[in-house]
Amino acid sequence: MKNLLELRDEIDVIDKQIVALYQQRMQIAAEVAEYKIETGKKVFDKDREMEKLATLSALGDSAFNRHGIRELFEQIMSISRKRQYQLMTEHGIYEKPDFEELDALDYKNARIVFQGTEGAYTQLALKQYFGEDAGNSYHVETWRDAMEAIASGDADYAVLPIENSSAGIVSENYDLMVEYGHCIVGEQIIKIEHALLGVPGAKLSDITDVYSHPQALMQCARYLEGHREWEKHSLKNTAMAAQKVREDGMRHKAAIASRLTAEIYGLDVLEEGIQDNKQNATRFIIVTGKHVFTRKANKISICFEGAHETGSLYHMLSHLIYNGINMDHIESRPLPERNWEYRFFVDFEVNLNDPAVQNALRGLSEETTRLQILGNYEA
């Protein structure tokens, strides 16, 4: 029997041969890229790769080796494609996304829409983001109404909640972004501090019914667990809950909303800081109908769909990983009328002008069934 050192020496020799053959193969792959550049052929030929994988894996002398050979060559082919995408980008063959590059966004006299009523957290995010330009704003009843206002030209920008640090994503707004095809041009993160609000003179012992947005109720779950006798009611946002409590004028009704909302609607603060997570925050996106980005933009949001098969998500994300792109966030949403199939949303740190992202997006556009760039904005 050979000792371990002898076996390792043999493996080292084989590994050097593999490296030499790999580099030889990649050189030929580069020549393939040159041919495809000249002829306009696509890099990814799925039928050809599937046929080749089947042929190569059949050469294995056991089920284990056949599986391993297939996996090995899947990786080799994937790297080969990435090299070809890179060469095409270097040759200036890159279909740029339909986005206009601007020096800066102009918010002067902009019409801005938000969902809810006066005092909603969305309005607070709007004011923090737009500052002095926030004067020409108005509210609508639903998030869809806000997106419709952009589509119809009644508003230039909309502000939508997209994610909360405690309750997770606002799934409806992810779906609306895909449906309407609007563009994210900014984001605003605000700290969420919930308070229990009642009509003037109400006491904690009077309360039997609590109103708020479903996510706000979730974010105060531990506090509400201590008051199991209270009936919980969901409304479209926290400000609407405060407005209802004020209009009903009944001492047994309370709202979960912000202190600012209490001031707007003339309610008393019965308890403050009732959210479970004291670092609770919500991320809002700023949306417009024009596909634009600025030179300072440093975050991209995309969504994509892929084949419903083993390893599909890994292969799609590998385009970002291989190009050294740092992912901030990944989320999935079920595809309508296609049970157990999903659309993926990914945020990553980069600008559309970066060659690395151009390589990654080229690969994704060829190897996914659908790719949509939701926006490139400053975070």
Locate predicted features.
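Domain-level signature for soluble enzymes in the chorismate/prephenate branch of the shikimate pathway
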Residues: 1-379
